[in-house]
Design a protein with these regions (language model features):
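Low-complexity, highly charged intrinsically disordered N-terminal segments
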Residues: 1-24, 80
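Structured beta-strand/loop patches that form or line metal/cofactor-binding pockets in enzymes
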Residues: 13-17, 26-36, 287-293
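Short, charged low-complexity intrinsically disordered segments located at boundaries
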Residues: 18-33, 127, 223-225, 247
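A short glycine-rich, hydrophobically flanked beta-strand micro-motif that places a catalytic Asp/Glu
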Residues: 22, 26, 31-46, 282-283, ...
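Structured, charged N-terminal subsegments at the starts of enzyme catalytic cores
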Residues: 39-60
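Domain-scale recognition of functional cores that engage charged ligands
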Residues: 45-47, 60-66, 71-330
Length: 330
């Protein structure tokens, strides 16, 4: 599906900012800019006994500490067998970082991790990745995005207050959405394009992950593989004869999602800051529900291969109030 988007120049349909297309094409064609990790959100079809793809979080997926550490600790603290859980997320992250380091052995294995300030949950997610990178042989550091300096000719730097010097890094992991950079930080998008193309910087996740972060990829998949048992019908326009879910192309945590009944009435919706974006309409599929009325959605982490499972519990639309739920395989 990603190749189809690139070959057919569907970037605008995907909602991808024009100023990121050059970097997307470049990183797509160069295997040294490998994808680090993503999370697939899935629903389970109990009748047909297979899963349905809800969406893919390819750029800035979270729930790392809950999946890698918390649910594993729950097993250990209760004296349960840790092998009764599908969870090798940390080990796979270490291996993937090591692979990326080897792909880029012409660069210094130094990586700076960054988030937006005042989002402590993002900082916790990044701490998991920092430990994995450290175990993979990287020198690691952290700085908020407003503390990072970018030079179009020299690279990426962090100020070291201890000796009043600037430290250069050849790798940068940002838990900051690519589309935010493209739309809101246009100068930074231009600088990053130059740095990446001139081998001054490797950015994780790479720019081509926007191909999968955009929910328009669900429409592309349906067009390529209509009625595939793992997919739900997805269209650019509302489906008046079928219950559906309206989603903006780059929304997060359930923001600006609506459930639309047959005939067009909205039965459930969550507000948010992404309302001016284009939408796709995905066939509604009921999530599994417990006796208290909570719904459950599976999150499957992918790091070169599927490697960990966790669940989120909440209402009809899972938003930023959803709770993480661990699992055990009997």
């Amino acid at each position: 599906a990603g190749r189809y988007v690139v070959d057919n120049h569907l970037f605008r349909e995907m909602g991808i900012p024009d100023n990121l297309v050059e970097m997307i094409r470049y990183t797509w064609a160069d295997e040294r800019h490998a994808h680090l990790y993503s999370r697939f959100d899935l629903a389970y079809d109990e009748q047909e006994q297979h899963v349905k793809l809800i969406e893919c979080n390819a750029d800035t997926a979270t729930c790392l500490p809950e999946t890698a550490v918390v649910q594993w600790a729950q097993l250990k603290s209760n004296g349960l067998d840790e092998n009764s859980q599908f969870n090798t997320l940390h080990e796979e992250l270490v291996e993937r970082f090591a692979h990326i380091r080897l792909l880029n052995d012409d660069l210094t294995p130094s990586i700076l991790f960054s988030t937006l300030r005042d989002y402590p949950e993002d900082d916790t997610n990044v701490s998991i990745l920092m430990e994995a990178a450290r175990e993979a042989g990287f020198d690691v550091a952290f700085a908020y995005i407003d503390e990072v300096d970018f030079s179009e000719t020299e690279g990426l730097f962090m100020h070291d207050p201890h000796n009043a010097a600037f430290i250069r890094f050849d790798f940068w992991f940002k838990l900051i959405p690519w589309e935010f950079i493209g739309n809101e930080e246009k100068e930074l998008a231009s600088i990053l394009t130059s740095l990446v193309k001139n081998r001054k910087l490797v950015v994780l996740n790479p720019a081509h992950t926007l191909l999968y972060q955009s929910k328009y990829i669900l429409k592309v998949l349906w067009d390529l593989y209509p009625y595939h048992p793992l997919l739900l019908q997805t269209e650019r326009h509302a489906m008046p004869h079928k219950k559906s879910v309206a989603k903006v192309l780059f929304g997060r945590e359930g923001a600006n999602v609506s459930i639309i009944e047959k005939g067009g009435d909205v039965s459930e919706s969550v507000s948010g800051e992404y309302g001016n974006q284009p939408r796709i309409y995905q066939e509604y599929f009921p999530l599994q529900t417990d006796e208290a009325g909570y719904t459950y959605q599976a999150g499957l982490f992918y790091v070169n291969e599927a490697c960990a499972l966790g669940f989120r519990r909440g209402g009809k639309i899972l938003d930023n109030t959803a709770q993480f739920v661990g699992h055990m395989i009997e």
